[in-house]
């Protein structure tokens, strides 16, 4: 019994050590955002600033000079719309692959699922050409259209819908309900946990996406927060206290989302390989 307890204690200490190591950069980032520039690289590190500047760094970052607020709003716009559309599209697709019987349904789904093995980088050139020909290059609509479809979202919601008895849908059909009514009034409410999982994961993926806006946006007025951070680091002249204040501002929505939805993130990761 004692050996088991000692083993658990050692294991717990190791986990806490790993967790603290992973949190150290985040804590340093938050601490640095409240420091004057001359205290940023002091050694040993002062986790609590000796001469705190309060929120002055944040006020400067969010001032009109750097347009940080515009990048923030652009990210919110793209992320929220893309997440909402992906939930709707994935849910409708999953319903079609589970509750509507048609020839070749399962075979087509396997082919569809097999495309997950294709790296997204392979399709960048073709996407670029398509966006240009459609007149959607350098627009938020183009970014949203490219990020609103997800094989993982379809797979996740299909697995959830497979757990819903077909008898519920059949009973609704007998009462005169059509597919849309069955979907929105019966199926959709029953898969809310999976929808929440997809919403949290999709929000994180889109908010952190750097590659897609980098390739398909050239107008600074349309830049998302990730491109804005890169531009800000160049314009601020490597003033690390300001850069860390900007980084904290960019990370804050994800931190809050993780604290509120960590259960759904864990469920999503446990349900299969995560791929955006």
Label each PLM-derived region with a short phrase:
Residues 2-276:
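A structural signal for multi-pass alpha-helical bundles of membrane permease subunits
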């Amino acid at each position: 019994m004692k050996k088991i307890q000692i083993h658990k204690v050692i294991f717990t200490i190791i986990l806490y050590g790993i967790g603290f190591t992973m949190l150290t950069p985040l804590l340093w980032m938050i601490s640095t955002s409240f420091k004057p520039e001359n205290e940023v690289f002091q050694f040993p590190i002062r986790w609590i600033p000796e001469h705190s500047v309060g929120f002055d760094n944040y006020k400067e970052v969010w001032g009109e000079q750097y347009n940080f607020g515009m990048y923030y709003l652009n990210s919110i716009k793209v992320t929220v719309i893309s997440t909402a559309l992906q939930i709707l599209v994935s849910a409708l697709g999953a319903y079609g692959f589970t509750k509507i019987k048609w020839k070749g349904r399962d075979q087509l789904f396997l082919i569809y699922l097999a495309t997950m093995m294709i790296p997204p980088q392979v399709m960048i050139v073709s996407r670029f050409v398509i966006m240009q020909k459609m007149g959607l290059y350098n627009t938020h609509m183009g970014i949203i259209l490219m990020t609103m479809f997800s094989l993982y979202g379809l797979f996740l919601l299909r697995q959830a819908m497979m757990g819903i008895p077909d008898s519920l849908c059949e009973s609704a059909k007998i009462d005169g309900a059509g597919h849309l009514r069955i979907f929105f009034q019966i199926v959709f409410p029953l898969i809310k946990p999976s929808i929440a999982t997809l919403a949290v994961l999709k929000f994180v993926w889109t908010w952190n996406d750097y590659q897609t806006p980098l390739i398909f946006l050239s107008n600074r007025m349309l830049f998302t927060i990730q491109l804005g951070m890169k531009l800000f680091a160049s314009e601020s002249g490597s003033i690390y206290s300001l850069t860390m204040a900007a980084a904290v501002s960019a990370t804050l929505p994800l931190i809050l989302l993780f604290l509120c939805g960590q259960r759904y993130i864990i469920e999503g990761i446990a349900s299969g390989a995560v791929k955006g």
